Amino acid sequence: MLENLSTEHRNEKTMNLDEMNIKEILQRMNEEDRTVALAVEKEIEHIEKVVRVVIQSFEEEGRLIYIGAGTSGRLGILDAVECPPTFGTDDKMVQGFIAGGLKAFTKAVEGAEDREELAEEDLKSIGLNEKDTVIGIAASGRTPYVIGGLKYANSVGASTASISCNKNAEISKYAKLNVEVETGAEILTGSTRLKAGTAQKLVLNMISTASMIGVGKVYKNLMVDVQSTNEKLVERSKRIIVEATGVSYEVAAEHYEKAERNVKAAIVMVLLQCEYGEALEKLKEAKGFVKKAL
């Protein structure tokens, strides 16, 4: 029942929200937002367990799949689509599904979130298997679409996790690992795109970033698998080589081109003073970890 969910409760601090001036509204929102990171902090041990499972999936050439409805689904897609340019992944490695399909990203599809079978259809369409990890996202913790997806994922032997913003969430029963970030009442009653959505975004940031670090997509704190898909990212790639090696911009640019715009290879070439082919071989032996290749 909705009345039992803390995300649906009325916030005692905003009973007169419609009487506040603009500055008061913004200050109250900011005060409430400050509580979100602290709520996430309480779940770090559970988030860590999820990251370990995702890393295992990646190591076995499995995938990370997010499923959700509404804001939760959109946040999953947002995290997924940022992985290729940031970490050099293909677009299959991390994927997001939203109830109602991609058209629901920009316009609500009525009733889609209430149909468990839609998630099963979505996961079947990508050939979900036991190497994959499925993470169900629902602020309320009770969305049928997410429950259906987790049920199907369990049936094929995939790893499962849930992210919700209520304790003892319904979806937690259907996932092997659970992250329950209790964000409490929103300033606008029931509008879980606010604190709950912020919490979900923070957790997704943690999961994808820590998992990519775990499979060698980062050297020191540099995103060395960045894809140079535009002029800004080409410049960033060269700067990463400068930061990682200490050489001049000109030398970094030269090695960047010699390495066929492979930032990792360029770094190894500079630091080991080797040719492109040898750098690739060392990276292959090190399973993509620059530090191990050196």
Swiss-Prot record:
Protein name in UniProt: N-acetylmuramic acid 6-phosphate etherase
Leader sequence segment: none
Keywords from the UniProt entry: Carbohydrate metabolism, Lyase
Domain SIS: 54-217
Molecular function (Gene Ontology), one example: carbon-oxygen lyase activity
Name of the gene this protein is made from: murQ
Superkingdom field: Bacteria
Quaternary assembly: Homodimer.
Family membership noted in the UniProt record: Belongs to the GCKR-like family. MurNAc-6-P etherase subfamily.
